[in-house]
Amino acid sequence: MGVNLKDLIPEEAKMTIEDLRMLRGKIVVIDGYNALYQFLTAIRQPDGTPLMDSQGRITSHLSGLFYRTINILENGIKPAYVFDGKPPEIKAKEIEKRRKIREDASKKYEEALRKGDIEAARRYAMMSAKLTDEMVQDAKKLLDAMGIPWIQAPAEGEAQAAYIVSKGDAWASASQDYDSLLFGSPRLIRNLTISGKRKLPRKNVYIEIKPEIIELKKLLEKLGLTREQLIYVAILIGTDYNPDGVKGIGPKKALQLVKAYKTLDKILKIIPKTEFPIEPEKIVEYFLNPPVSTDYKLEWRAPDESKIREILVEEHDFNPERVKNAVERLVKAYREHIKSKQLGLEAWFS
């Protein structure tokens, strides 16, 4: 889920990307689990049923990964994906919370189907989506065939992506979660994999979702905080490591407290008595110094057309003609854009 910093992001620290070609030549490290989960929840039949092959295996994530990655490449962006490793022990409460939410949503989905409430069924189906190890392995195989690099993180993928960007090996990390900023990513791109028109829940209203870039340096300057103090704010609101946060404290109140008292010790003394699942100091330390791998390569290769067809058409029953056309687009994008020089937004970020 990540921490909810949305209401604290000032306009001066973010920029809407009206055209993905503005990111042409940029290397962007995408949170793989985050992206696959988005595809898994969004790409569904009207009643909430995911796309499946003839053997009943879910393919929504592969469809989203394949076509969206091609779209990203066609705009001259050089994508790489990073995947979560073993979740840290301090995340156990959040993982259990998510499991219960999925179980409850699954029951409500079945009930909605029995009642013929298609809209509710779709909503609960999305909430009950689960990303399995098999799905992740299939995604990695597809990326290999497409010639797209991926990195296996030892723990949190967002931390690994932030490390790669902070080392200068990529221009930005991409995720829906603001945790990337807490892990120190200089730039975070949101909505990269889900841009387009989306229907609002329970309303017959569609909104246009566009990618946006948040720059950590500008964010901290505008808020008047250090990165460590931003982590304090997140802890008060609630993170994946203390999902309940502090009762009665929302984003704006948390910001006020941190700016007034500045240190964690002073903040903890004045807030309502709270039982943290783990010492707040350990949460701070994890965000500042998470486990990351220094052994990674960002190398793009020519697509393996026959392997892509084998995975999508032969193994998972994708439409042969549609895959053929998409592969042609992929090959063209690789030839035209993958080696292009970084252009675009230096002026805005200088």
Swiss-Prot record:
Textual note on the cofactor = Binds 2 magnesium ions per subunit. They probably participate in the reaction catalyzed by the enzyme. May bind an additional third magnesium ion after substrate binding.
Spans annotated as Interaction with PCNA = 341-349
Q: Which Pfam families does this chain map to?
A: XPG_I, XPG_N
Its required cofactor(s), as named, are: Mg(2+)
Give the residues the record marks as binding Mg(2+) 2.
D177, D179, D240
Role summary: Structure-specific nuclease with 5'-flap endonuclease and 5'-3' exonuclease activities involved in DNA replication and repair. During DNA replication, cleaves the 5'-overhanging flap structure that is generated by displacement synthesis when DNA polymerase encounters the 5'-end of a downstream Okazaki fragment. Binds the unpaired 3'-DNA end and kinks the DNA to facilitate 5' cleavage specificity. Cleaves one nucleotide into the double-stranded DNA from the junction in flap DNA, leaving a nick for ligation. Also involved in the base excision repair (BER) pathway.
How does this polypeptide assemble, per the annotation? Answer: Interacts with PCNA. PCNA stimulates the nuclease activity without altering cleavage specificity.
Q: What is this protein called?
A: Flap endonuclease 1
Q: Which organism is it from?
A: Staphylothermus marinus (strain ATCC 43588 / DSM 3639 / JCM 9404 / F1)
